[in-house]
Amino acid sequence: MQQNKAFDDWLASTALGGANQSYIEELYESYLSDPQSVEESWRKTFDSLPKTTALEQPHTPVRDYFRRLARENHNEAVTVIDPAAGAKLVKVLQFINAYRFRGHLEANLDPLNYYRWKVSFVPELDYRHHGFTEQDLNETFNINHYVYKRDTIKLGELAQMLKETYCGSIGLEFMHVQDMEQKMWLQSKMESLLDKPLFTSEERVNFLRELTAADGLERYLGAKFPGAKRFSLEGSDAFIPLMKEIIRHSSRQGVNDVVMGMAHRGRLNMLVNVLGKKPENLFDEFAGKHSSERTGDVKYHQGFSSDFAVDDKRVHLTLAFNPSHLEIVSPVVIGSVRSRQTRMNDTEHSKVLAITVHGDSAVAGQGVVQETLNMSNTRGYSVGGTIRIVINNQIGFTTSNPNDTRSTEYCTDIAKMIQAPIIHVNGDDPEAVAFAARMAVEYRNLFKRDIFIDLISYRRHGHNEADEPLATQPMMYSIIKKHPTPRKVYADRLVSEGVMTEEQVTEMANDYRDALDNGDRVVSEWREMDTAKMDWLQYLNYDWTAPYESKFSQERFLTLAKRVCEYPESLRAHPRVEKIYNDRKAMYQGEKLLDWGMAETMAYATLLDEGVNVRLSGEDAGRGTFFHRHAVVHNQNDGTGYVPLTHLHANQGRFEVWDSVLSEESVLAFEYGYATTDPKTLTIWEAQFGDFANGAQIVIDQFISSGEQKWGRMCGLVMLLPHGYEGQGPEHSSARLERYLQLCAEQNMQVCVPSTPAQVYHMLRRQSLRKMRRPLIAISPKSLLRHPLAVSSLDELINGTFQTVIGEIDELDPKDVKRVVMCSGKVYYDLLEQRRANNQKDVAIIRIEQLYPFPHEDVKKALEPYAHVTDYVWCQEEPLNQGAWYCSKHNFESAIPESVKLKYAGRPASASPAVGYMSLHTKQQKQLVEDALSF
């Protein structure tokens, strides 16, 4: 019994059973798929299994076989001679696993040796914790390649090797990764650290050169522009060699396009020392010089693009523009990368790389980080892995106590939600940093998943250069004042190892300073980029009133209409979906007028026919929140989906429709990044309800409404925002139209409220066909999707155009009109139906379909027949303090006679967008319609 117990203990703690049963199962399944994918020792063991063992069999017989294999003392397996030896081997394997699990906690990660990065003592990493004594250090154990590819090893040697591997300048967190192949790769990569030397003398000198550049620029700026904000990189200087090593190594692995996003910390250093921005241009920005007509932005928000030479090829680099709102640029970068990958047909995600740079407080504190990570492995948003770097200077403005900044051990613990490995690395060790860079690139390229690099460093100055950090961090900054710079630490190391002399180190710094004095580029790898890859110049200075070709061939239209209504006979659609498609067939056959869903579908179909690409995403975008779109037909037999818009013809544009993750902020930011990268794709984001779009308010305020004015970034993104008062309460009624109008100026974006299917058709086509790329805010309907009056004829689509204003449609004699009511959106139909019910002939109703840019001439033309009228009303469903009234009243008044006072008909001012009771809603709706029509 004692013998069996020893074996049971051993099996419970090794890879051959017990607590590690999942390990053996996954390893065995890998072997069944490809015997060469497992180590030779495992392969021999699996080869010895009974031939009847098969993948579809229960795993219990396999585990039982291993238990029997161990007891029968087979040569291929780890064997135990006696209970004492077996018990010791258990402890050895537990000791090894302790380092793999928890070695990072004792790693030498903090350059200051000040905070929690170095836990004082982790008991499991001491051999004595596992019951060994000093006398056991010379004992040799048979570990059968379990670590370091060794058959046998002395305990003392093993302890030293594990400490050097897992407790040096790199701390790897990877045991939360569940995929066995990834885990084994990370483990093997980490345990190869002992195979020295890792870098040549030439590479090491280059690391110092890059540290010298990082240090030299900050010193130069500090002396030349004292007190000016630059958000210095000092203390985290290793970020520059880290970035350049990632670029170099990824290029050698096939990447030819790198898109980066980062906040303000170290951004100027990045611009000059990685992307190759001319120092003299940066100095001009410090001096306040500017030549652009745009309002511009501060220097540490600016983006940049360049080409970077690696060996005999070039890598295109892009640093995204971004605001001070931390972390929001990350999903923008991911969207830009996805757009490039799609354009290049990079289905393997091997040509374009995303790198996002975070701060330690922000990566743990900003919710958009979680939202972006959640998208990372989804079909519609994945880019095949992102390298995420945290510049961890252990302080957020004035807050440095981890107990205040987060509730986790590390700031990077958020990475574990997607099982991303985390490489913690000491910022004072550039060689460890370079190793982390290469490891991250190789992992991402091999497994197409995110990986984090936690660059643990410090901030030499305050949050900005005018800030005094000693006031709030006296202890930390007393250490920083005495601590040598990363450049000094590494230079001393190279000199002591005979790689360089003191004179060479000094000469290197002098040469860099001289280059700055001359204003020359300091990045030898910089190359002038090819600007012909994507032509944006054709979209500059376009007049939004200029005409465009809106007509479409009737024959071609009907052919496309037939195809968008077809799906395979073998596909069994849901009965309601089948009816919708049958109704659409009747529409193109002229038996029915077109509804909203058909008109929208035909907008996409006709654009695709002309070679335009279309990307539509949002929560429930495939079906449509209100069951109107059905761009994807789901087979009721097997759950597969069919997208008719992807089956028009061989030369059509690309159509994508994605049901998004349940997030507004990250998804809208992603689509903004996508749209700013590809002007030839009609990019659309649809809110589930317009009410929920304010979950992405940062994106709307900082990017969509102001990106062109601040940074010159054109964007043709469409936002579809379902809006309308139908008694559904304050959370399902309003897209907050007033907020978009309040953001409008300098023709920065368009705000449209289409009221007919033909209007949405032409609005979407116009957005793509005009040579203008500015955001379109489309206030889309809900109840109008099926309203019997909200229909259009085939002719209105084929031969019509977008109307910024729609005049009176009933046969009223203008001379009989005593009041003109102007309105937008769904309320028009409430007014029309009530007027018809009243048999009124003295009130004309004018629809303004585009609220911004306001179509002054078109409105005046629509009002011309009523020049004699002195009673004008603006009617809206929204409360007085919301909707278009306050923001557009001056525009409405400019279109009517000066002597006339414009009246208001609508809900009274309200703190809430809408009431929650249907009875009260109905009463209010009836009252505002009555106010508009009665006089």
Curated annotation (Swiss-Prot):
Keywords: Glycolysis, Oxidoreductase, Thiamine pyrophosphate. Its cofactor is thiamine diphosphate. Gene3D superfamilies: 3.40.50.12470, 3.40.50.970, Multifunctional 2-oxoglutarate metabolism enzyme, C-terminal domain, TPP helical domain. SUPFAM superfamilies: Thiamin diphosphate-binding fold (THDP-binding). GO terms for molecular function: oxoglutarate dehydrogenase (succinyl-transferring) activity; thiamine pyrophosphate binding. Disulfide bonds: none annotated. GO terms for cellular component: cytosol; oxoglutarate dehydrogenase complex. It catalyses: N(6)-[(R)-lipoyl]-L-lysyl-[protein] + 2-oxoglutarate + H(+) = N(6)-[(R)-S(8)-succinyldihydrolipoyl]-L-lysyl-[protein] + CO2. Its EC number is 1.2.4.2. One of its GO terms (biological process) is glycolytic process. It is an enzyme of class 1 (oxidoreductase). Homodimer. Part of the 2-oxoglutarate dehydrogenase (OGDH) complex composed of E1 (2-oxoglutarate dehydrogenase), E2 (dihydrolipoamide succinyltransferase) and E3 (dihydrolipoamide dehydrogenase); the complex contains multiple copies of the three enzymatic components (E1, E2 and E3). E1 component of the 2-oxoglutarate dehydrogenase (OGDH) complex which catalyzes the decarboxylation of 2-oxoglutarate, the first step in the conversion of 2-oxoglutarate to succinyl-CoA and CO(2). Belongs to the alpha-ketoglutarate dehydrogenase family. This is 2-oxoglutarate dehydrogenase E1 component. It comes from Haemophilus influenzae (strain ATCC 51907 / DSM 11121 / KW20 / Rd). The gene is sucA.
